Amino acid sequence: MKQPLILSFLLLGMVSAFHLETAHLENPKREESLKQEADGSREQGRELALTQETKQTEGEEVEGSQHQDIFEDEEAMESDPDALNKDSACPKEEDTTHFQGTPGCKSCNYVLVRTPETFDKAQRVCRRCYRGNLASVHSYSFNYQIQNLARKINQSIVWIGGILRGWFWKKFCWMDGSCWDFGYWAPGQPGSGGGHCVTLCTKGGHWRRASCKSHLPFICSF
């Protein structure tokens, strides 16, 4: 009677030991599997962060290229006009045509300079040589006067003092700071035009946007 009982206890002990050993063998495998899963999750997280960072960088590059035109057109306008090109000669008299705007207005003096310059250089010439600015236009009659004068001396397009400024809220401004209260845009302008500076075309007298780096004759008011 005792012998079968002893055998039963021995058998039960062997089974328990087998289960413990099996659990001990399986546990490292489970730990290794969990470790691999954790490593994979961390790697996926790093890849996702890198992808997001790359997309952000690409977006910034695209945005930067879209605004490059504005920087190129406006960066020089931030400088002090009187401090630049002081040693440059003013236009020769034979390259200019003086005229008066409103009859009897002593302060309404204008000069058309036939020497082509960029918008920025033209503004600096107006400031330094004539103590004025690129001309602002506030009426059809004066616009027509400029148109006729430029056409008579064979100038097809000239700078006037208008420039597009701003980022999200863009607006046209005159270089002399006067109110923008008149416009004579060509069909489709200014919305479909490129560039940030304003020209007057003598054929029709309409205004068009152009790159501020273009070299054109210009009109100063002083």
Swiss-Prot record:
It comes from the Eukaryota. The keyword Disulfide bond applies. SUPFAM superfamilies: C-type lectin-like (SSF56436). Gene3D superfamilies: Mannose-Binding Protein A, subunit A. Disulfide bonds join 126-220, 197-212. Residues 1-17 form the signal peptide. Keywords: Disulfide bond, Lectin, Signal. Residues 27-100 are annotated as: Disordered. One of its GO terms (molecular function) is carbohydrate binding. The keyword Disulfide bond applies. Possesses similar cytotoxic and cytostimulatory activities to PRG2/MBP. This is Proteoglycan 3. It comes from Mus musculus (Mouse).
